[in-house]
Amino acid sequence: MSETTDVTKASQESLKYTIAQLGYSGLRVNNGIISEEIKRELQFPQSILTYKQMGYDSTVASALNYYEHMMLKSDMKVKPHPEATEQEKEYATFFQECLEDMEDQSWQDFIQEVSSMNKYGFCVNEIILRKRLESKGSKFNDGKIGIRKLPIRSQDSISKWEYDEEQNLVGLTQTVAKMGKRGKVLLSSKGEEIFIPRNKFLLFRLGKVKDSPVGESPLKACYYAWKYKVAVEEQESCGIHRDLSEIGRAHV
């Protein structure tokens, strides 16, 4: 006996496709602070101090220095494609000129600053442009817009990340402590807050879990081993001190 199936025409409402964004990555952001870590010591911005302390360890420092050295060994040259047009060749030449025409900053200096992401998980460098004029300190005098410098914005100076209603990163807030005489930091002052829009800085990061701007530091996986090592060393030093204090002295 044959079976029959009723087929009804789909409504126009069910055929509509929404092109707008509905969900988001799920990144936990509370008042500009990324709140993904369970351990407070590994949560930004406290993590910056933690990783800085870990960087004093000889084993950790050796690994970080090795990665920095390998990054500095890389040679950066902009070469056009063999089948590039004349205009594309001009673009490549112009970009190479910009990298070699930065003020008080070489390409190696820039890479060395970027290598700090190996410790902290991310690195922010502000984009500062200028007209290529000799009066502005440039090697060229064609009036084109070139790169003045790409200075780092230190990780411990970034206080929060700014997001819009659709959870898109729109910038960051940097807190710069006010300095007194002879470079002394005025601890009683809250410092000055500076907003840097997203199109004004480069963001380098290791890992993009939930598209987090702070990335994921390689030192995170070493944290418990490092903490245990520090605790054992402190216990050993206390034991050695006690043993030495019990050595008697004889006077003749």
Predicted regions and their residues:
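Structured, contiguous alpha/beta core segments that scaffold functional sites
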Residues: 2-59, 69-70, 89, 93-251
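Active-site acidic/histidine clusters and adjacent loop/turn architecture
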Residues: 71-78, 83
